Every structure is written in structure tokens, then in C-alpha cells.
Amino acid sequence: MSMIEFHDVNKYFGKFHALKNINLTVDRGEVVTIIGPSGSGKSTLLRCINGLERITSGQLIVNDFDLADKKTDMNRIRKNVGMVFQHFNLYANKNVLQNVTLGPDLVLKRNKQEVEQEAHDLLKMVGLENKADSFPGELSGGQQQRVAIARSLAMQPKAILFD
């Protein structure tokens, strides 16, 4: 069963044709890597899957929802599709634990104690259990990336996109 389907998807930024007639199916549980030079549309493709960019034409189905349909609840899509950005987008004024727990607490409205325990487990999984009280500015780039991964996993998504 497919998780993501592109059918003749195009994306324009003004006159620039960023995605041209993309056809791709990603099945549940499948791992896919998109490679290409800088500026080839990899980030744009991921941002379309997560609903951060709208496609210009074609059909994009994510988890059985048609993203070209303006009635589709994009927040519901984003709850099920995690994203780890190139620049991680961590909150500089929040410590590592707060960065990981913010989504499940505010967006999913989950029990704060459960969320914190799961966050500690995730931080242990990514080798940062001793950094829960540190702030992003105190971490190396690799450590920040692992916090971003833990933060994405904390939302229990059905898919995770890595840019």
C-alpha cells in the first residue's frame, strides 16, 4: 500500500520549473533516497510532501489525502509526516528537552509526563541523554541534527522526511 504518490506533478516558482512531471510511488515501510545536485528540486519535493509548498499541477497523495485539494487539512498531514530540515530549526531559547516535547505537548495535546519520559528515551536513542538541559547553541551541528531527529520522532509520524 502506498504512502506517497506523485502523478505528473509540476511545481513552478514564477517561470522557474522546479519540479517537472514527477511520477513516484513510495510504499509504507519503504526507504527512498532522492539524490541530485544543489538546486535540482530535492528540498522542493520534500516541502510539497509536507504541505509547506503547494504543487502547481498534477496529483500528490500523502497517506490517502490529496494535497492538491484545497480542502485537505494540512495540519493532519503534518502530524503524520515528520520533517528534519537542513538547518534543523531548533528553538534557541528552549533547551533540548523542551525542543523535543513541544510538538507532542502543544500539537498532539499529550500527557506532559508521558511526553517527557518518551523524550528522554528518544534522547537516549540518539546518544544525547546527558544534553536534555543544554540549549541548541551549546551543541555541535551533529548534536543539533540528532535533537531534530528526536523531535521529529516524538510526534510519532508515519513517515519522516530528511532534507
Whereabouts are the PLM-identified features?
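ABC family nucleotide-binding domain
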Residues: 2-162
